[in-house]
């Protein structure tokens, strides 16, 4: 009975599938033989693959396959080979100071490459992928160093961090809040003077008064010339590099309620070798001393 209702296309003489969409019918042509054979071939290939390689998940592991192949075992072999190739350089790094590593061209090249990888994983989240930093996070490409840019000084900062309380050798500096010590007028004068060191202030007539306020309250840390003090971690205010924000209002805000960043001590987390590699990498960025 069903054959009596089959529709045949008048032009091609081929039966249709019997369905119609907005007057459009589909010819019931058989699939090309090459397509059918290809389809069967993929089925055979899949069955062969499932037999030869690990494929079917079990309760504790997958079937091992007739070839006994394991991608994890292959990766383990490659990792072991890579570690063996690096062993010589790593041994030299372990027994050398940061300065000695930099003095050895081959070892420096290895340390810079390894340090760059460690930087991307552990440091780029704050300092940026290009180490250019951001507001509150120092730019590591320039030569504006709070604690010094010599190899061992960089190592010390990375190893023990900044204001990382659990580490007894961490870098520590703290600017007191001047909001309770100075009037708004005095802070405005000081901000005018600080800004005048690198650009034109909005109120030039306050600069001389601010210079005196600075000498009385700020020079003990930042220096009489406002160029900072690395022993105390006091930043240079006479350059055009601003860590917490630029302009008089940013200076006033930092004076009134100072913000102090925290950098973790990386030595316990990464180990001495990796910290040395990071120090060599940061030193190589262009601002190292």
UniProtKB/Swiss-Prot annotation:
Residues that bind heme c 2: 175, 218, 221-222
Every Cytochrome c domain range: 110-198, 205-286
Keywords, ordered alphabetically: Cell inner membrane, Cell membrane, Electron transport, Heme, Hydrogen ion transport, Ion transport, Iron, Membrane, Metal-binding, Oxidoreductase, Plasmid, Repeat, Respiratory chain, Transmembrane, Transmembrane helix, Transport
Residue ranges of the TM segments: 34-56
Membrane topology of this protein: Single-pass membrane protein
Cofactor note: Binds 2 heme C groups per subunit.
GO BP, sorted A to Z: oxidative phosphorylation; proton transmembrane transport
Residues holding heme c 1: 123, 126-127, 263
UniProt subunit comment: Component of the cbb3-type cytochrome c oxidase at least composed of FixN, FixO, FixQ and FixP.
Name this protein carries in UniProt: Cbb3-type cytochrome c oxidase subunit FixP
Organism: Rhizobium meliloti (strain 1021) (Ensifer meliloti)
Gene name for this UniProt entry: fixP
